[in-house]
Amino acid sequence: MYAVIETGGKQYKVQEGDVLFIEKLANEEGSTVTFDKVVAVSKDDKVSFGTPFVSNASVTAKVLCHGKGKKIIVFKYKPKKGYRRKQGHRQPYTKIQIEKINA
């Protein structure tokens, strides 16, 4: 059994027990999160697609930790003009574990 959920503007295919790195959520570590935006559910070799979401379907997950991703360096310059700008960015994420798929 698997489901496709939408969170943070992205879609993820999940199964029970999966560990995911998703866009940062405001929930505390150790708390549970329910995702109601389920795009598709597969159960007993039958796939149900939503329009846009499957009704009466949800996915429950546990928040494991929060963190920051690898540093990305953004460097802009204009040749022959002495214009240089260097900036770094680390994207925050939330690590979750899928506990249950309700369909």
From Swiss-Prot:
Single GO molecular function: rRNA binding
InterPro entries: bL21-like (IPR028909), bL21-like_sf (IPR036164), Ribosomal_bL21 (IPR001787), Ribosomal_bL21_CS (IPR018258)
Keywords per UniProt: Ribonucleoprotein, Ribosomal protein, RNA-binding, rRNA-binding
Superkingdom: Bacteria
One cellular component (GO) term of this entry: ribonucleoprotein complex
Presence of keyword Lyase: no
Coiled coil stretches, renumbered: none
GO BP terms in the entry: translation
Keyword check for Lyase: no
Protein's job: This protein binds to 23S rRNA in the presence of protein L20.
Subunit structure: Part of the 50S ribosomal subunit. Contacts protein L20.
Family: Belongs to the bacterial ribosomal protein bL21 family.
Protein name, UniProt field: Large ribosomal subunit protein bL21
